[in-house]
Every structure is written in structure tokens, then in C-alpha cells.
Amino acid sequence: MKNFRLSEKEVKTLAKRIPTPFLVASLDKVEENYQFMRRHLPRAGVFYAMKANPTPEILSLLAGLGSHFDVASAGEMEILHELGVDGSQMIYANPVKDARGLKAAADYNVRRFTFDDPSEIDKMAKAVPGADVLVRIAVRNNKALVDLNTKFGAPVEEALDLLKAAQDAGLHAMGICFHVGSQSLSTAAYEEALLVARRLFDEAEEMGMHLTDLDIGGGFPVPDAKGLNVDLAAMMEAINKQIDRLFPDTAVWTEPGRYMCGTAVNLVTSVIGTKTRGEQPWYILDEGIYGCFSGIMYDHWTYPLHCFGKGNKKPSTFGGPSCDGIDVLYRDFMAPELKIGDKVLVTEMGSYTSVSATRFNGFYLAPTIIFEDQPEYAARLTEDDDVKKKAAV
């Protein structure tokens, strides 16, 4: 699939109206990503992990397409409730839940929960008696960018005891869930986890617990600045085939976050300062590591950077606007000579970027604008139509 990317002309015309830094989100691209997953992984319903990007327009779009939602807190439930999303379309997938989150779940009729420790059972039983629960198991995957199984997931050998304890406490033991880790490059990790889950389903049946649901988490990868050589269609189809083979009568869902929005958002930022240090040019941008580049620190991520300057390229350093020396974004990046006021485009900025940005040093948060609401979108459609007409002649 082709990722969303603004042209140089679009960047410059947008920046004439909107002060940088700002994010540009393409709803068309989000919808394309959603439909791609439904086409190649049809056995798994979608619970979008809204922590990746809770932009209201994106949430409304996905709800309209039929997506459900993975929520982690009372705040996320409140956002969805205000958008008209019913609690039956949510799963409270944070394995550790606080009192405020459990109260919100009860208030908004959220009935699905995940957990991985006995300490959660009593909390859920009191706050949401009779709720549907899935035990989260730890799985192995050394090909994931971000490991989620050190902090989360019960040992496999304890999973059914946890479900039995939940059942004894008046909760409904619904199923098993796992997460292979963020930005997973291996289909094998999913396939191995599915085999483990199948064994647990069979053992649960022998114990008198009929499990009906399986949550395979997220982890589907998107491109970064280092490039990515993964056939997503083949990856999803292989997983779908295993689900069909191992779980023909089970309700299955997935929780994509990064995959759904990562390729659908661009950042437009400006050079606000230039200097030379150690014979290398430095360019200071008006967005940095405490803003939308927070994923460099929190998410081990490298975002594709695009400069529009002319001339020979040389190794350059890019930094953010804060007074913190750690606010360095790129080192030895091959860039043409830039000057103050030049615009820089950063792609694949749709997930775990603005959502973890801060107001450190008092800098304003970069707003998100919707590309389809801008005149540049209409102009792009007109240009595409003209190209098609010429090609047809």
C-alpha cells in the first residue's frame, strides 16, 4: 500500500495558512488501512487501540466503519462515549485497572476485560459483577520492536487457574488474549501464540470451562526511516489461515494501533535556527523530542524526514526547540543546505507521536488538521482526474 505523503507544493501552501508545527491526517488512508486488514484478516474483528492516536475524527471514522475499540482508562472511555460509541463496542484491555477506570466501565456498560494477575479478580468482581474476562498470557517474540511481555501477561501454566478463579468470583471466563509486541516482523510469533492458545482452550474444556473468544492483540508493522521489508498481506493471510485451522468456531479479534494510523499522518515543521558544531551543520526545528518526536525516546522509532532544499547533501544534525540537550532528533542525516523558515516534512507520524507529546518549556502542542477538509485535498483529486484523463487518451 502507498503511504500518505504530502507533496512539496501541498506542504508550502498549507504552511502559508497554518503556523508550524502541525500534523496532517488523511482519513482516506486510515480507511484504506482498515479495509486492507478486513480483507486480508477477515476472521479477526477489529478493536482499534485508540492509545495510538485518539484524534476524534479518526475515532468517528473507524466507528462508522464498524470498528470496536481497545481502551486503557476512564479517559479513553469518556472520549468514545462523547462520540456516541456504546460500551458494548469497547474492551478494557489494560491488565491493571484503577478504581476510576472500573467505575467508568460500569457507568458506560463496558463488559469485556483482560487481566493477568489474581489481584485484578476481586476488583473486577466488585465493580462489574458478571463481566466477561480474558486472561492475558505472556508470549515470546524476539522480533518485536517493543517488548510488551516483560510487564504484561501471565505465565501460560497459570492462565487456566486464573480463569477458574475469575469464574468462581462470579465473572464469566470468556477466553484468552495475547500481544506479541509492537512492530512485530514475524508471523511465526503469532502462529506460536495461536498454538499455545489452542492448547489452553482444549484444557479449559476439560476443566468444564467453555471458552468462546480469542484476542490476538496488535503488533502489525508499519514502515520507518530504516525501511521495512514485510509483506503485510501475506502476513495477515498466514495468520488468518492459522485461525481458520485452529479456531474455526471461535470469535477472534485483533487490536491494531500503530498499523491503523502510523502511515496516515504527516508532520510539517520549520527550521527556526541554524548553527555549525564540529564542522557539521545543525538545524533546529520547531518540533522536538518533547513533542511529536516523543516516539524516538518512548517508542525506539525513527521517522522518515524529507527536506526540500536544493544543492549537495551533507551529514547534518537536526534538533528540537527545547533547552534540553537531549532534544536531538537526527545525527549525520544527509540533507541539503537549509535556512531559517524552510519547511521540513516528516512522514509515518500517525501513531504514538502527538498522543505522548508534552508542553515542556511551554511550547504549544502541534494541532492535527484533516487533509480531506483542506483545499489541497480537492486540488489533489482534480490533478489525479486530469492524469487519468490524459492516460485514457
UniProtKB/Swiss-Prot annotation:
One of its GO terms (cellular component) is cytoplasm. The modification N6-(pyridoxal phosphate)lysine is found at K51. InterPro entries: Ala_racemase/Decarboxylase_C (IPR009006), De-COase2_C (IPR022643), De-COase2_CS (IPR022657), De-COase2_N (IPR022644), De-COase2_pyr-phos_BS (IPR022653), Orn/DAP/Arg_de-COase (IPR000183), Orn_de-COase (IPR002433), PLP-binding_barrel (IPR029066). Gene3D superfamilies: Alanine racemase (3.20.20.10), Lyase, Ornithine Decarboxylase, Chain A, domain 1 (2.40.37.10). The keyword Lyase applies. Its cofactor is pyridoxal 5'-phosphate. It catalyses: L-lysine + H(+) = cadaverine + CO2; L-ornithine + H(+) = putrescine + CO2. GO terms for molecular function: lysine decarboxylase activity; ornithine decarboxylase activity. Disulfide bonds: none annotated. Homodimer. Belongs to the Orn/Lys/Arg decarboxylase class-II family. Mutagen studies showed that it is possible to convert S.ruminantium LDC to an enzyme with a preference for decarboxylating L-ornithine when five amino acid residues (Ala-44, Gly-45, Val-46, Pro-54 and Ser-322) were replaced with the corresponding ones found in mouse ODC. This is Lysine/ornithine decarboxylase. It comes from Selenomonas ruminantium. The lineage of its organism: Bacteria, Bacillati, Bacillota, Negativicutes, Selenomonadales.
